[in-house]
C-alpha cells in the first residue's frame, strides 16, 4: 500500500527511495492523490537530503513517462533528433540560431521551450513578437514542421511531462527551486519526452545566471550529463559565462532581430557566435553528423555562410504560421518601441573601461520596461528592451553608447537608463578578458 507520508519520512531520514517509491509518488502527483503539502514536504526533504544518481534517474523517468513521449520513428526522419537546453540568462538568443544551424547540417530539432520569468528572457516570448507564429500548434503541424524545416520551436503542451508542471509550481512557492536533483529531473523529464538522440546543456555561471556560483553550476552540469547518459541519450554540457549579456540585445523583438542579423550575416556578436558555434558543434558530434568538433565547427560556418541555416529559420517561421517573407522584412513585421534613444555617459567616464556588469540588474531593467515578467501571468510589451549593449573591456569615449534603450515612453526610458547605469562598474585599466566557455562536461561524471 502506497502512503505518501512514508516516502516523505524515508527521505527526511536520509533513507534512499526505491524506484517504486518514486514512481508511486509521481503517479499520486498526476492523479491528485498526493496533496500540495505532501509535494512541498518531499521537495524540502530532497532539498536538504539530496538524491543518489539512481534516485535522480528514477525521478526523471517517472516524470518523463507521466505523459506523452514523442516517437519519431513513424516519421522516417533521415537524421538524428537533437536539442539544446539553456539554464537561462540575459541576451541569450542562441536557440533561435542553433536550431536552424543543426537542421541545415542534417539534424532534426523539436525544441520545446519556455517563457521568461524574472531577469531571464524566454524563447517563446521572443517568438510571440513574430506575427502569426504559433507557439502552440497541433501535433500534426508540429511534426510536419520538424520533418520539413528540420526545426520547430514551440511551447510545452500539457501532455508532455505533466507531473513536472505540478511539482514545479509547488517548488516555485516553497523555496525549493534551487535543488540540483529536482532541477535535473525537471529539465530532463521535459527534454527526454521529446524523443531525443542527443542533448547539449548550456549551463550558465556568473552574476546573471540562475545559479551564479561556479561550483553549483558545475554540479548541475555533471548531474544533467550523468542522468541523461544513464537514460541512453548522448548528453554533454558546456559551462558558459553569464557575467554580462551574451548578445548585444536584450528583450523580445530586439533579440529576434539580432538572430535574423546573425543568420543572414549582417552582424554576429563575437561572444554569441562562440557559444552558438560550440553548442551546435556538440550536437553535430553527438548525433554522428560530424566526426570531430573541428569538422562540426566547419559545418556550422558553411551553413551560415551559404544561407542554408537562414533558409531553415524562414521555413520554420512560415510553417508555424508566421510571414513567409519574415527574413527579408523582419524590421517591418517586428513591433517597434515608441522611443528608441541611445544612453551615453557623461564626460567624467571618458577614458575609463567598462570593468563589470551586474547582469541580473541589466535583465531587470528589461522587466521594468515591460519586456519581462515579475509574475507568471504578466503581459509583456514585446517591443521594448535594449540594443547595442556595450561589452566588458570596452573603453568609453564621447561617442560610446552604453545601450540603445527601446521604451514606450520617456519616463520608462529614464528609469531603465538609471537601472543600467547602476549595473555598470568602470576602472582606469582594462579588465582581464573572461572566457566565454569555461568547461565542457561529458562522459561518466557520477
UniProtKB/Swiss-Prot annotation:
Assigned GO CC terms: cytosol
Listed A to Z, the keywords are: Glycosyltransferase, Transferase
GO terms, molecular function: 1,4-alpha-oligoglucan phosphorylase activity; thymidine phosphorylase activity
What is one Pfam family matched by this protein? Glycos_transf_3
- To which pathway does this protein belong? Pyrimidine metabolism; dTMP biosynthesis via salvage pathway; dTMP from thymine: step 1/2
The biological processes this protein is annotated with in GO are: pyrimidine nucleobase metabolic process; thymidine metabolic process
User: InterPro entries annotated for this entry?
Assistant: Glycosyl_Trfase_fam3, Glycosyl_Trfase_fam3_N_dom, Glycosyl_Trfase_fam3_N_dom_sf, Nuc_phospho_transferase, PYNP-like_C_sf, PYNP_C, Pyrmidine_PPas_bac/euk, Pyrmidine_PPase_CS
Tree of life domain: Bacteria
* Catalytic activity, as annotated: thymidine + phosphate = 2-deoxy-alpha-D-ribose 1-phosphate + thymine
Q: What does this protein do?
A: The enzymes which catalyze the reversible phosphorolysis of pyrimidine nucleosides are involved in the degradation of these compounds and in their utilization as carbon and energy sources, or in the rescue of pyrimidine bases for nucleotide synthesis.
Q: Which family does it belong to?
A: Belongs to the thymidine/pyrimidine-nucleoside phosphorylase family.
Q: How does it assemble?
A: Homodimer.
Name of the protein in question: Thymidine phosphorylase
Q: Which organism is it from?
A: Idiomarina loihiensis (strain ATCC BAA-735 / DSM 15497 / L2-TR)
Amino acid at each position: 500500500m502506497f502512503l505518501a507520508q512514508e516516502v516523505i519520512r524515508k527521505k527526511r531520514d536520509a533513507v534512499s527511495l526505491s524506484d517504486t517509491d518514486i514512481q508511486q509518488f509521481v503517479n499520486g502527483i498526476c492523479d491528485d492523490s498526493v496533496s500540495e503539502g505532501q509535494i512541498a514536504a518531499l521537495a524540502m526533504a530532497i532539498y536538504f537530503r539530496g538524491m543518489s544518481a539512481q534516485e535522480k534517474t528514477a525521478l526523471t523517468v517517472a516524470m518523463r513517462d507521466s505523459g506523452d513521449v514523442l516517437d519519431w520513428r513513424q516519421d522516417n526522419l533521415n537524421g538524428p533528433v537533437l536539442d539544446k537546453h539553456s539554464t537561462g540568462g540575459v541576451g541569450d538568443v542562441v536557440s533561435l540560431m542553433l536550431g536552424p544551424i543543426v537542421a541545415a547540417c542534417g539534424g532534426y530539432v523539436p525544441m520545446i521551450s519556455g517563457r521568461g520569468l524574472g531577469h531571464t528572457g524566454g524563447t517563446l516570448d521572443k517568438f510571440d513578437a513574430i506575427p502569426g507564429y504559433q507557439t502552440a500548434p497541433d501535433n500534426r503541424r508540429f511534426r510536419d514542421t520538424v520533418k520539413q524545416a528540420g526545426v520547430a520551436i514551440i511551447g510545452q503542451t500539457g501532455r508532455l511531462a505533466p507531473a513536472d508542471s505540478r511539482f514545479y509550481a509547488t517548488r516555485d512557492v516553497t523555496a525549493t527551486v534551487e535543488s540540483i536533483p529536482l532541477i535535473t529531473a525537471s529539465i530532463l523529464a521535459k527534454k527526454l519526452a521529446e524523443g531525443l538522440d542527443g542533448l547539449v546543456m548550456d549551463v550558465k555561471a556568473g552574476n546573471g545566471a540562475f545559479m551564479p556560483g561556479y561550483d553549483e553550476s558545475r554540479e548541475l552540469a555533471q548531474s544533467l550529463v550523468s542522468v541523461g547518459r544513464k537514460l541512453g541519450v548522448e548528453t554533454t554540457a558546456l559551462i558558459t559565462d553569464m557575467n554580462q549579456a551574451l548578445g548585444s540585445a536584450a528583450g523580445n523583438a530586439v533579440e529576434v532581430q539580432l538572430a535574423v542579423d546573425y543568420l543572414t550575416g549582417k552582424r554576429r556578436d563575437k561572444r554569441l557566435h562562440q557559444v552558438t558555434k560550440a553548442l551546435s558543434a556538440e550536437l553535430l558530434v553527438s548525433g554522428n553528423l560530424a566526426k570531430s568538433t573541428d569538422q562540426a565547427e566547419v559545418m556550422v560556418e558553411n551553413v551560415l555562410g551559404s544561407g542554408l541555416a537562414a533558409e531553415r529559420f524562414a521555413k520554420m517561421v512560415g510553417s508555424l504560421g508566421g510571414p513567409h517573407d519574415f527574413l527579408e522584412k523582419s524590421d517591418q513585421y517586428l513591433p517597434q518601441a515608441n522611443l528608441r534613444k541611445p544612453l551615453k555617459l557623461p564626460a567624467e567616464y571618458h577614458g575609463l573601461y567598462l570593468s563589470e556588469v551586474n547582469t541580473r540588474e541589466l535583465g531587470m531593467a528589461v522587466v521594468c520596461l515591460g519586456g519581462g515578467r515579475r509574475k507568471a501571468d504578466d503581459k509583456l510589451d514585446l517591443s521594448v528592451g535594449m540594443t547595442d549593449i556595450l561589452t566588458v573591456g570596452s573603453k568609453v569615449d564621447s561617442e560610446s553608447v552604453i545601450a540603445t534603450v527601446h521604451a514606450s515612453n520617456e519616463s520608462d526610458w529614464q528609469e531603465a537608463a538609471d537601472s543600467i547605469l547602476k549595473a555598470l562598474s568602470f576602472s582606469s585599466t582594462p579588465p582581464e578578458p573572461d572566457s566565454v566557455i569555461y568547461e565542457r562536461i561529458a562522459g561518466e561524471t557520477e
